[in-house]
């Protein structure tokens, strides 16, 4: 895995549950070499924690803005996260 230079928490809103968004996110994360997790939230949004090289995180956020076929992303919020206790892979956690 790549060295973690940055970590970002992301919340994606819109039609993002029931459309394969988490599996698609995991696949895109693996392609880009970022680590972290993705999960569904009770309010219908999807949350993710993404860590890796700055350029890979930027590319991942751009992909999250588009989402997979069948999704309709209406918003993406990001905030810087701590690099402590980061996963070494990318997981679907809920």
UniProtKB/Swiss-Prot annotation:
What are the recorded GO MF terms, alphabetically? acylphosphatase activity
Q: Which residues form the Acylphosphatase-like domain?
A: 7-94
What does it catalyze?
an acyl phosphate + H2O = a carboxylate + phosphate + H(+)
The alphabetical list of record keywords is: Hydrolase
- Top-level enzyme category: hydrolase
Q: Cite the active-site annotation.
A: 22, 40
Q: Does the keyword Chaperone apply?
A: no
Record-linked PANTHER family: ACYLPHOSPHATASE
Q: What is this protein called?
A: Acylphosphatase
Which species does the entry assign this protein to? Rhizobium etli (strain ATCC 51251 / DSM 11541 / JCM 21823 / NBRC 15573 / CFN 42)
């Amino acid at each position: 895995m790549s060295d973690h230079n940055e970590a970002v928490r992301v919340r994606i809103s819109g039609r993002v549950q029931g459309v394969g968004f988490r599996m698609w996110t995991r696949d895109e994360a693996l392609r880009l070499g970022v680590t972290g997790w993705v999960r569904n939230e009770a309010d219908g949004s999807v949350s993710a924690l993404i860590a890796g090289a700055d350029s890979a995180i930027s590319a991942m956020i751009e992909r999250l803005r588009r989402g997979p076929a069948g999704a309709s992303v209406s918003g993406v919020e990001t905030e810087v996260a701590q690099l402590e206790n980061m996963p070494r892979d990318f997981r679907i956690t809920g």
